[in-house]
Amino acid sequence: MNNEPTKIPQATAKRLPLYYRFLENLHASGKQRVSSSELSEAVKVDSATIRRDFSYFGALGKKGYGYNVNYLLTFFRKTLHQDELTKVMLIGVGNLGTALLNYNFSKNNHTQIVMAFDVDREKIGNTVSGVKIENLDNLENKITSDVSVAILTVPAAVAQKTADRLVNAGVKGILNFTPARIAVPEHVRVHHIDLSVELQALIYFLKHYPL
């Protein structure tokens, strides 16, 4: 198995966790092999795209046989660094932040929120699902070197200022749930998740592109 890092298109990289989750389900059900058409039906990605995605990693399957589920699962587990725990911090413990803490990636044993911050004096010091809520004023003193990813669920008005503090503290990745489009240096990656925008887009497609 090739363990060298492979540079792949970002669109492909975003689909890898989707493949991995389905492969986990297949493995749990005892299935030993799967075809690209079966994968396509399950993850709603056309089979040609799946084959192209997989081709970036070399020969992962055999023509006429398909893919060995256990082999693929092991391969993508290593590719997605699922053999190691990724510690994450949460900034903002409002309704969404609290929901994320309660969920805390329970279906993914390799990602875990280990610290949370807020400015609300009534929340500071409380514990939600085993995670103590710290004072955001103490952010820089509390961040440890093994936590380089942050989830941002603060009000949009303070999103950029908070992101600046995270970057200065050494954070390398931010999952931004705020409506603000935050600016960060080139060495920091941000993924924006705006639930309102996603819902508006869904409604638009339902009205203009009915199935």
Curated annotation (Swiss-Prot):
One of its GO terms (molecular function) is DNA binding. The keyword DNA-binding applies. InterPro entries: CoA-bd, NAD(P)-bd_dom_sf, Rex_DNA-bd_C_dom, Tscrpt_rep_Rex, WH-like_DNA-bd_sf, WH_DNA-bd_sf. The keyword Nucleotide-binding does not apply. Gene3D superfamilies: NAD(P)-binding Rossmann-like Domain, Winged helix-like DNA-binding domain superfamily/Winged helix DNA-binding domain. Keywords: Cytoplasm, DNA-binding, NAD, Repressor, Transcription, Transcription regulation. Signal peptide: none annotated. It is found in: Cytoplasm. Its main location: cytoplasm. Residues 18-57 bind DNA. One of its GO terms (biological process) is response to redox state. NAD(+) binds at G92, V93, G94, N95, L96, G97. One of its GO terms (cellular component) is cytoplasm. Homodimer. Belongs to the transcriptional regulatory Rex family. Modulates transcription in response to changes in cellular NADH/NAD(+) redox state. This is Redox-sensing transcriptional repressor Rex. It comes from Halalkalibacterium halodurans (strain ATCC BAA-125 / DSM 18197 / FERM 7344 / JCM 9153 / C-125). The gene is rex.
